[in-house]
Structure formats: C-alpha cells, structure tokens
Amino acid sequence: MLFRSYAKTEPERVKKALEYFTKALIGYVKACKKIGVDGFYTPTQGGEIKFYEVPGFFETFVKPYDIRVMQECNTQTQFNILHICDYEGKYDDLTRFVSYPGQIINAPCEVADQPFSLQACEQLFKRPAMGGLYRKGAILKGSSDEIAKEIYELKKTLKGKRFILGADCTILPQTPMDNIRTAIKTSHHTCNIE
C-alpha cells in the first residue's frame, strides 16, 4: 500500500530507490555466477490487479527493473525459471510478461478468476511450464489420496505431454512434509505410467 502511494506522489524518488535495488541485485547475480551458479528462479510481482490504481505502474516501476535483473540472470547461465508470483494479489492478464526471459515459466493456477492450466501457460509463453499444484489446495491440506489424485488427473489432462510438476507459488510453511513426500513419490510413479 505504501509503495503504491509513493509511486503516485513521489515517482522520481521511487525510481531512484528502484535503481539502487536493481544495481544491488545485478551485483548479487554476478557474484552468484562467479562462484558457479548456473541458473536462477526469478520472481516478479507488480502486475497484479491492485496496482492498476497507479496509471502505468507496471511499465514504469516494475518491468524496466525486472528486465535488467533477469537479463543478467540469463547471461551465461543454462537454466532459469520465470516465476509470476500471485502471493500478494490476483492477475487478470499475463501477456505483459511474455517478453520476460526464462526457459521455464511458473505462473499462477488462476488468471482473471479462471483456471490457468499448464497447457495455457505453454501456449501463451511458447516455453515449457512448471506447476500444476495449487499451493493452498491438496498439497497443503489434502490426504495422500487427494494429492495423488490431483497429480494423476493433471497427467491425464496433459495427454502424454511432458511437464514439470510444482506448485503455483512457494508452498506455505505449514504444508506437511508428508504431503510433499507424497507429491514427489506420486510424480515419480506417474513418470512410468502412460
């Protein structure tokens, strides 16, 4: 809320602060690559519906800075995941992220209050998608059978296409480890089933 307020009233000061953050992140990325990191999980936020109250918010205060950091992440690395984070709010459209770098896309399970499938993600971004599990769904509060069913159903809807199983965002800290183990075990088992 405070960030949006300052973006309206003090846009030049906000841009100056973002410039400092961007330079620091680029320095961090370079240091990581220097010690051997060969890929990054690059998250973005700021395109959520709640930011529409500030005209041009995404184009002015998010994308230019994101792109600079993500381009550095994608220079001389082999594998990078673009994560479109909906932890702070919903999206009504993801097309503004299509030009973002990253070999794999991890997007929300819901866009414009509608399910957003891995197939839809691959079709929009023309790159492989990672996800399929809603972080607040079966992985968080379901039984082993419910988790397994969700993964088997996902595989069935993909009709033999390869996919990278994951959550739509960071799984919550209270997610039971047994549920995570069930998801891993089930995903390994589904690899051997046509």
Report each predicted region and the residues it spans.
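Active-site loop segments of alpha/beta catalytic cores
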Residues: 1-194
